[in-house]
Amino acid sequence: GHTGLGITRQYRDGSLLNPRLWVMPVTPYGNYATFEEFQDFNVPKAEVIDWYRSMVDFGLTYNTARLVYAHPPGAYEWLDVTRNFIAYGNSKGANRFRWYTIERLADFMAKRDQVRWSQTPLPTGALQVVASHPSSLAEMVWSVPKDRYLKPTSVTGATVSDGGAFWLVKARAVGTLRFQLKPNPNYRPA
């Protein structure tokens, strides 16, 4: 099953029947996923609050999205927990944490699926990365591990920012981007 995964594809008997369809599996807390279930099975509110906070932290740590599901009547009955969850997510800052609808994530994934990119070794030992999209690469980001590569150079169609352990190569609203990656001389494979 897909339970707990990020946005993914739906395969039936090993076949991708609808390549335009994206699915967003629910992420449960153990056996339960809704406020009604938490209430029916006496899951303490403090545990649910901790779980919601850990979901936000997981999303930030792994740069991913997970679906947390709630029926409106159940959310209303647990309004204190709902408000705590929303406040915790918002407290992380809009530049680090965002709320998305399933539709918005599916649109992004469909756009991402159209990105074509390649990396070519250069005689200098660097890698040349080239990416393209039929309409725009806007919103696309390449995470480059700093321990393995120096700051990307010869960048066109993108900006480079410091993402902690990664260089973030963020595409502009262009059809094609390029950048070069030079190996970090201090890199030691594990």
Give the location of each predicted region:
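A residue-level signal for beta-strand positions that form part of recognition/binding surfaces
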Residues: 20-21, 126, 176
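Active-site-adjacent pocket scaffolds in enzyme catalytic domains
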Residues: 1-59, 108
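Residues that flank catalytic or metal-binding motifs in active/ligand-binding sites
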Residues: 20, 64, 138
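Surface-exposed beta-strand/loop patches in extracellular or lumenal glycoproteins
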Residues: 132-151, 179
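C-terminal domain-boundary segment and adjacent tail
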Residues: 4-6, 46-134, 148
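C-terminal beta-strand-rich structural cap/linker in extracellular carbohydrate-active enzymes
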Residues: 138, 163-190
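Small-residue (G/S/T/A) turn/hinge positions that recur once per unit in extracellular repeat modules
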Residues: 155-159
